[in-house]
Amino acid sequence: MKDNLVCMGIITSPHGIKGAVKVKIFTEKPENISLYGKLISGSKNYDIDSVSVIGENLVIATINGVNSRNEAEFLRNKKLYVERNKLLKLNDENEFYQSDLVNMEIRLENDELYGYIKSIYNFGSGDILEISVISTKKNIMLPFTKEIFPYVNIKERYITLNMPEFIG
C-alpha cells in the first residue's frame, strides 16, 4: 500500500487554540491540498476543512474533528499522504511527480550506473537532487536542470546525468 501513497505534506505545529495546524506542503499549489479528499497518516484518515496559504509552501489548515490545540499537538510531524490514483493525470511524458524520482537510478551518458536519488530539495531557486554515489559511498547535491539531467525515463526508473566538469 505504501507504494500507492504520495506524501503531500507534513504537519509542523499547532496554530492557535481551536485545533488548526501549520502544514508544510509538497504540492505545486498549496491551496489545493484540500481537493484530494481524505489524507492518510498511518492508520488514520483526515479531512481538511479549510486552508489558508501563509507562505510559499506553508498553509494553516483546519482538520475535521480536531478542535483544540491539544488535539492538534498530537498531529505534530505527521506526514500526510494521498492515494496515487487521486492525483491529477499528467498530460505529457515529460511530466512526473517528484515522489516518482526518489530511489531512481542515475546513469552516466555511457549508461554506467552512477548512483541513486536519495532526496529532492527546493531551497527557493529550483529543485536540487541529493544523489548517493556508488563509487564513493558519499552524497552529492546537483541542481535538477535539463543541462545536467537531460533525460528522465519514468517507466524504466532512471535519469541520465551529463556529468559537470567540476565533479569529475
Curated annotation (Swiss-Prot):
InterPro entries: PRC_barrel-like_sf (IPR011033), PRC_RimM (IPR056792), RimM (IPR011961), RimM_N (IPR002676), RimM_N_sf (IPR036976), Transl_B-barrel_sf (IPR009000). Keywords: Chaperone, Cytoplasm, Ribosome biogenesis, rRNA processing. SUPFAM superfamilies: PRC-barrel domain, Translation proteins. GO terms for molecular function: ribosome binding. It comes from the Bacteria. GO terms for biological process: ribosomal small subunit biogenesis; rRNA processing. Gene3D superfamilies: PRC-barrel domain, RimM. Pfam families: PRC_RimM, RimM. GO terms for cellular component: cytoplasm; ribosome. Residues 93-167 form the PRC barrel domain. It is found in: Cytoplasm. The keyword Chaperone applies. The PRC barrel domain binds ribosomal protein uS19. An accessory protein needed during the final step in the assembly of 30S ribosomal subunit, possibly for assembly of the head region. Essential for efficient processing of 16S rRNA. May be needed both before and after RbfA during the maturation of 16S rRNA. It has affinity for free ribosomal 30S subunits but not for 70S ribosomes. Belongs to the RimM family. Binds ribosomal protein uS19. This is Ribosome maturation factor RimM.
